[in-house]
Each structure stands twice: as C-alpha cells, then as structure tokens.
C-alpha cells in the first residue's frame, strides 16, 4: 500500500513538473524577448557609440594590457570614466528603461522582475549599470567582465585575467550560468544579447552587449511558494562542475543563504542522485538544502520528479539532443513522511480496531460457552431423577421416596397367618 501511494504521488509530481517546466519556458522566452528589444533600441546604439569613443575608456583598456603594478592608475582612469558626462547619460538612459519595466509589477504581479540592467563594450568592460534598488552604488563600472558567460556565451566562467581577442563576445541571445554579483553578493543569472548598429553597406557592427539580471527566486513561476511539503525547484542541468546547482528554492526566499559552508560555493544535487531522478519511477530524494544549519524543514525523504526546461533554440525532439539533461531542470518534490504518514496511521488504527474486535469477539464467545456449559451442568440426568409417588385417595398428600430394593431377611418374611 505504501508503494502504491508513493507511485501515485510520483505520477502527480511528474505531471506538475511538466506543467511547471512549460510555464517557466514561457517566462524564459519573455526575458529573452525583453533583452533583445532593449538591445535593438536605436538610442542605446547611439549612446554606446559615443561612450566607446571616450578617451578615459580607451585608457582603461590600454592600462589593462600592461603588466601588473598599474592598479592605482587604472582606478584613477575608472574614476574619470565614471564621472564623464556621456557615461552619466548612458546610466540615466538605462535607469529610465529599467524603471519603466519594473513599473509594470504594480499592475501585474507576474510581470518580469529585474535586479539590474547593464551594458558592456565589445571588449567586455562594463560602461553603465542601473539597479532596481537605487541606493546601490556600483563598483563594476570600468571593470572588465569578459570572463563571464553572459559575455562569451560558454557554459562556465573563465579565468579573470583573460581578455579579448583571446575570447570573443556572443553573437546571439544567451542565458548565463549562475554567478554572484560583485556588488550585491546575491546569486543571479543574466540574459544577454549583442548590440548591433546597422552600417552603411547594409551590414552591422557590434557596439556592445546588453544584459539584464534576475535574482534567483525572483522568477514569477517560483514567487510566493508558501507550501513547505510540496514545491518546485530550479536547477542547472548544464554539463560541468556546476551541473545540479540549485538556482531557485523556497528556502532562498525565507532568508536561507544561497551558499554552503566549506569548499562548496552553492547547494548542488550530486551526480548520482541527479541520474536517479531521471528514472521514470518514484525516487526517495534527499534535498541538499537539508545540509544547511537551518535547513531542518527540508530533511528526510522526498518523492521527486524531474523535467527539462527547453530554452529558445534548443532541440524539441529529445532524440536530437546530444545530452539528456537540459540547460535548466525543474524538480517537483513532496514530503514522503507527510504523504505516507496518514496511510501508516490508518494502518495502526485498523490494527488497533482489529485487535479490539478480536478481544471483544473472544469475550463474547467465551461468555456464551461458559453460560452453556454452566446450564448443561445443572440439568439432572435420567438415572438420578427421584421417583414421584402419586398420592392415593387415602393419603393427604403425595410423597416422594427414594426406594432401594433389598433382599428381605427371614424375620421380615410375610406372615401367612395374616
């Protein structure tokens, strides 16, 4: 019975995982559409052209190519660049675009939510950043981030010392690997797209990279997950050391740190457990969040089902994919104890009632046998029944006698004389 219940719960979770994956695919597509729309804004293209030509920005690029020891000079160049009027105009433009997007949340709680919007030049240097929280002061402007996946489009971040042209920028829209913001220290992902400006010969040239970031937990599909016993989790399915990383979990929204202690950077499903989750049968799954100091709500066994999320441009037919794991995966998990405890409790109650019924039946049966046996024991047998003498007319009442036939003695012989 317990296996049947778990199998039923698994099938329910598998259906929910498919539904959640489809909903998330739609949301991901919205983010891609937004970043492409922003990258295609003509005003942004013109602003990027003017900023790219600033001497202070070129000075930063030249200094970064020199040997170590020019850190103070680079800082001075970055300060000059960030104080430039043209750079301020680019920042104000990005802030206005971000505020306009975020304003939609007041009327539509399910609207896309952004943490920041920023642009990089073709060499990977951030030229302007706008945050949803305007009190945040960026320390990223003027720094090179071409090692990030949102710039080069690879599956993982590269060495921080790498520079163009050793690494080339993306040519199409891209979803980055999870990374930690150098300013806010919050884990997030970025949607990025190249900024092209049409050229006179009918072609186009790259003038920068547009990127929008989303804090893990701010995707509409996973906002306000208040259920502690059944919920969906987003994980990174891309091959490599980050495969299985938990990108979104209800625990993150309740204040749990997104990083683990020790050498681990973030919570991650182990490869063996990730492989088992792909089997089309119920699996007892252990939530990695349970390892956190305050992760007691997620300890124990869970019944989990997994479903891939197909990003725009990914193969529709699973047989055409080179890797069975998608870039993103949805895990729907349900607390095994909460699921099976009612069944176990019912079994205990039925066992108690069964034992009680047997005891009552035994008492009733024993009582009946005792009554019958006692009744049978009081009933006289035919040989012991007293002889009843019916009174003759001369007697005043009948008398009962127990007569015993005995041989008469000589003096008791009848007298013939009488």
Predicted regions and their residues:
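Juxtamembrane extracytoplasmic/periplasmic/luminal helical "stalk" adjacent to the first N-terminal
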Residues: 1-84, 109-115, 172-174, 187-189, ...
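Membrane-interface helix-start motif
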Residues: 1-3, 221-223, 317-319, 336-357
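Short N-terminal helix-loop-first-beta-strand/juxtamembrane motif that initiates sensory/input modules
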Residues: 30-47, 104-132, 160-164, 168-173, ...
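Intrinsic low-complexity, intrinsically disordered coil/linker regions enriched in small/polar
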Residues: 60, 160, 205, 217-325, ...
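Extracytoplasmic/periplasmic sensor domains and loops in membrane signaling proteins
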Residues: 80-100, 134-179, 206, 251-299
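Extracytoplasmic/periplasmic ligand-binding sensor regions of membrane-associated signaling proteins
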Residues: 103-118, 129-222
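Cytosolic-side ends of inner-membrane transmembrane helices, especially those
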Residues: 353, 357-378
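Cytoplasmic C-terminal tails of single-pass
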Residues: 378-418
